């Protein structure tokens, strides 16, 4: 890749995923308020936050270069991503506490839960923004409270939407998965990202 690549995320999971495509990127913290707006749908929320994170990441990159505004910024492609889960029509986010994680998994037990990941790529110089919503459905096993409690205490998925880490023991919670890209569930849909980078004139294969 010729253009500087910025990941607007401090998530170690997203960093590990992006490293599958290239080791040459910089991470910045986007510092975006993730509170949903009144009556905002899951799809609208993840698009708004992914775009906001990409722009905030560009601004942080600009500040680190010592530049005064985006119009004078060196060219970079900034990746923003956000994910929420929907259970029984309600948006759920990161549980933050063990009690909330146990409650989320009790709600999910025996059900199909859809995750929506918003992915944005923003050019810091031209201001071109591309964005996509990538859905992924998880079919949960019917889980006992003892199983859920054991899982939460073992893996502590407190900062994961849906209260699990699919790249770890969380895979044991699932009956089956539905989606085009399993990386989506971890937080960064790589197949979609490759296509979006191509829209900005970049390829990961050279």
Swiss-Prot record:
UniProt keyword terms in alphabetical order: Cytoplasm, Hydrolase, Nucleotide metabolism
Catalytic reactions of this protein: N(7)-methyl-GTP + H2O = N(7)-methyl-GMP + diphosphate + H(+)
Keyword Hydrolase: yes
Active site: 82
Main location: cytoplasm
GO BP term, example: nucleotide metabolic process
Site (described: Important for substrate specificity): 13, 83, 167
InterPro entries the UniProt entry points to: ITPase-like_fam, Maf-like
Required cofactor(s): a divalent metal cation
Localization in the cell: Cytoplasm
Enzyme class, UniProt record, top EC level: hydrolase
GO cellular component terms, semicolon-separated: cytoplasm
Pfam families documented for this protein: Maf
A Gene Ontology molecular function term of the record: nucleoside triphosphate diphosphatase activity
EC number: 3.6.1.-
Similarity field: Belongs to the Maf family. YceF subfamily.
Purpose: Nucleoside triphosphate pyrophosphatase that hydrolyzes 7-methyl-GTP (m(7)GTP). May have a dual role in cell division arrest and in preventing the incorporation of modified nucleotides into cellular nucleic acids.
HAMAP family cross-referenced by the UniProt entry: Maf (MF_00528)
Name the UniProt record assigns to this protein: 7-methyl-GTP pyrophosphatase
Source organism of the structure: Shewanella denitrificans (strain OS217 / ATCC BAA-1090 / DSM 15013)
């Amino acid at each position: 890749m010729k253009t500087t690549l910025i990941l607007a995320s401090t998530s170690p999971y997203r960093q590990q995923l992006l490293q599958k495509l290239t080791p040459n990127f910089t991470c910045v913290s986007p510092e975006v308020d993730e509170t949903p707006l009144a009556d905002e749908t899951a799809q609208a929320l993840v698009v708004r936050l992914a775009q906001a994170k990409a722009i905030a990441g560009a601004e942080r990159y600009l500040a680190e270069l010592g530049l005064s505004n985006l119009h004078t910024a060196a060219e970079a492609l900034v990746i923003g991503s956000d994910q929420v889960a929907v259970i029984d029509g309600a948006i759920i986010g990161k549980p933050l506490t063990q009690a909330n994680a146990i409650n989320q998994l009790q709600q999910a037990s025996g059900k199909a839960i859809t995750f929506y990941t918003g992915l944005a790529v923003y050019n810091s110089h031209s201001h071109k923004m591309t964005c996509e919503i990538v859905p992924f459905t998880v079919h949960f096993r019917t889980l006992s409270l003892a199983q859920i409690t054991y899982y939460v205490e073992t893996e502590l998925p407190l900062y994961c939407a849906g209260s699990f880490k699919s790249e770890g023991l969380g895979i044991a919670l699932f009956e089956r998965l539905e989606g085009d890209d399993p990386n989506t569930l971890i937080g960064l849909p790589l197949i979609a990202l490759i296509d979006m980078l191509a829209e900005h004139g970049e390829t990961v294969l050279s």
